[in-house]
A protein has these predicted regions:
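Conserved active-site-adjacent core of cysteine acyl-enzyme catalytic domains
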Residues: 1, 35-190
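Active-site nucleophile-adjacent alpha helix/oxyanion-hole segment immediately C-terminal to the catalytic cysteine
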Residues: 1-46
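Structural beta-strand segments of beta-rich domains
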Residues: 210-216
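Short proline/glycine-enriched turn/loop motifs at strand-loop junctions of beta-rich domains
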Residues: 220-225
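Beta-strand signatures of extracellular beta-sandwich domains
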Residues: 226-230
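Solvent-exposed serine/threonine-rich low-complexity stretches and specific carbohydrate-binding patches
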Residues: 241-259
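C-terminal beta-strand-rich structural cap/linker in extracellular carbohydrate-active enzymes
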Residues: 257-282
Length: 282
């Protein structure tokens, strides 16, 4: 999936989970600041966003559907079963929040959250040691690529962890796939957001927010048909149907001249901008 890496904030135990959700959300027409992600679970920014704890609460608030890996339903070691689960979601173009140990740290469950965005595989159901996983590690501006056989390790990080900074736990695994937007109308079209900068001004460190330039693309249009692109600056006001009657912030009405339409938008970095595009009148 064409999901560009983004840089996490490091304060308050790190914003890796927030950054991973930010990246996945852009693929579904949603910009959300790392600050807002954490504010959904704790307004004072003290509680981390964690997979298998509160990540789904944030995704649900953003009107995104999700599914977590059922770690309690598999015997240990789980890595191969987990990897097959990740592959199945990536095949369906669903980004996956994956968790990892970090060499030198000590949490018994995991230390870091990253976003898996693609896979090169011989099949899309089971583990194969030669598969290649594409993921954004929330530190590098480049997509990481690792062969499956190099991805996992135990807490001591003495095997694959001796060479790589991040390894998926071998024994117990945690993950959360982002399935798409909540849309009961079944009429909303795919919307993607691309940002011109891979970093977000770190308001936690005292940096002032800025205006981001965003390219908003709508796909699956029918030439000659009329559409409405709704923008919501408050995630609490995003509906799952009846968009025309909703409390949107702005709307662009347009007639499709091709199967894809692109618009340039300005977004305040520490805020929210969520887009829904539907046939006019929906």
């Amino acid at each position: 999936m064409p999901i560009a890496p983004r840089r996490q904030w490091d304060q308050k135990n790190g914003y890796c989970g927030e950054c991973s959700i930010q990246q996945a959300a852009l693929y579904f027409g949603t910009y959300v600041s790392q600050f807002v992600c954490r504010a959904i679970i704790n307004t004072n920014q003290q509680s981390q966003l964690l997979v298998a704890v509160n990540a789904q609460k944030v995704l649900t608030a953003l009107k995104l559907n999700s599914a977590e890996f059922n770690y309690s339903g598999y015997a240990s070691p789980q890595f191969q079963s987990y990897f097959g689960w990740v592959k199945q979601h990536l095949k369906l173009l669903r980004p996956v929040l994956i968790t990892a140990f970090v060499k030198g740290l000590s949490d018994p469950d995991y230390d870091h959250i990253m976003l898996a965005t693609g896979i090169t595989a011989s099949n899309f159901t089971t583990y194969n040691s030669t598969d290649q996983l594409y993921f954004n590690d929330c530190f590098s501006s480049q997509v990481s690529i690792r062969t499956a056989s190099t991805l996992n390790d135990i807490r001591s990080m003495l095997v694959n962890g001796a060479k790589y900074p991040f390894c998926i736990p071998t024994k117990i695994c945690y993950g959360c796939a982002v399935l798409g937007i909540q849309d009961n109308s079944a009429r909303a079209l795919p919307v993607r957001i691309t940002l011109g900068n891979w970093t977000e001004p770190n308001v936690i460190a005292g940096v002032a927010p800025s205006t981001l330039s965003a390219s908003v693309s709508v796909n699956g249009l029918v030439v000659g048909k009329s559409y409405s692109l709704f923008r919501y600056n408050d995630y609490r006001k995003v509906p799952t149907a009846n968009y025309t009657a909703s409390a949107y912030s702005t709307v662009r009405n347009f007639v499709a001249s091709g199967t894809t339409a692109n618009f340039t938008e300005s977004i305040i970095s520490n805020g929210v901008a969520i887009y829904r595009c539907v046939p006019t009148g929906s």
